[in-house]
Swiss-Prot record:
InterPro entries linked: Ribosomal_uL4, Ribosomal_uL4-like, Ribosomal_uL4_dom_sf
Subunit structure: Part of the 50S ribosomal subunit.
Pfam families: Ribosomal_L4 (PF00573)
Organism name: Sinorhizobium medicae (strain WSM419) (Ensifer medicae)
GO biological process: translation
Name of the protein in its database record: Large ribosomal subunit protein uL4
């Protein structure tokens, strides 16, 4: 499929052909959802913790004698049923990450790219270069392209002025092509790819 290449000023700069093997798949929500779940589980800190009965600071002495009171038999006040006792089966520090085959992760990225193209939410720009590190000028350029909520993917490295100018614009994320991922593609409205990013993706998946 051919798409028109734009400049940051909104002018036409030729056309680029996109590979159907990357951008022309019929999007499968189940594969995309698996990759998103994998990403979000992997980034969870897992620092949640509640003290169990062995960890709470409370006396371990028997509460009262075993027989003769008419009350239920109890021992330690650290037991979970008592106020101030330990939590039964509480959260512990752990990793939430789970495995996902590399082929499924790669397939999920291709389906996410295909979904964006099908929704007509991909814009190709010739180059991501700013003459000066001024947010106002770049924000104006984005407005001319209709970019109010976007993920922008550049080549292997993002040009310095462009990176500085873009980092303060709300709802706009800028990543090098090696940082492209399913979750960030889906959480933003438009996907902006530089020609260098398109070439790198086609090289990666060929």
């Amino acid at each position: 499929m051919d798409l028109t290449v734009k400049t940051l000023e909104g002018k036409d700069a030729g056309k680029v052909s996109l590979s159907d093997a990357i951008f022309g798949l019929e999007p499968r929500e189940d594969i995309i959802a698996r990759v998103v779940r994998w990403q979000l589980a992997k980034r969870q800190q897992g620092t949640h913790k509640a003290k169990g009965r062995a960890e709470v600071s409370r006396t371990g002495a028997k509460m009262y004698k075993q027989k003769g009171t008419g009350r239920a038999r109890h021992h330690s006040a650290r037991a979970p049923q008592f106020r101030g006792g330990g939590k039964a089966h509480g959260p512990v520090v752990r990793s939430h990450a789970h495995d996902l085959p590399k082929k499924v992760r790669a397939l999920g990225l291709r389906h996410a790219l295909s979904a964006k193209l099908k929704a007509e939410e991909i814009i190709i720009v010739d180059d991501l270069v700013a003459n000066e590190a001024k947010t106002k000028a770049l924000a104006g350029a984005f407005a001319s392209l209709g970019l109010t909520n976007a993920l922008i993917i550049g080549g292997a490295e993002i040009e310095g002025n462009f990176k500085l100018a873009a980092q303060n614009i709300p709802n706009v994320d800028v990543l090098p092509v090696q940082g492209i991922n399913v979750y960030d593609i889906l959480r933003r409205g438009k996907l902006v790819l530089s020609k260098a990013a398109v070439e790198a993706l086609e090289e990666r998946f060929k």
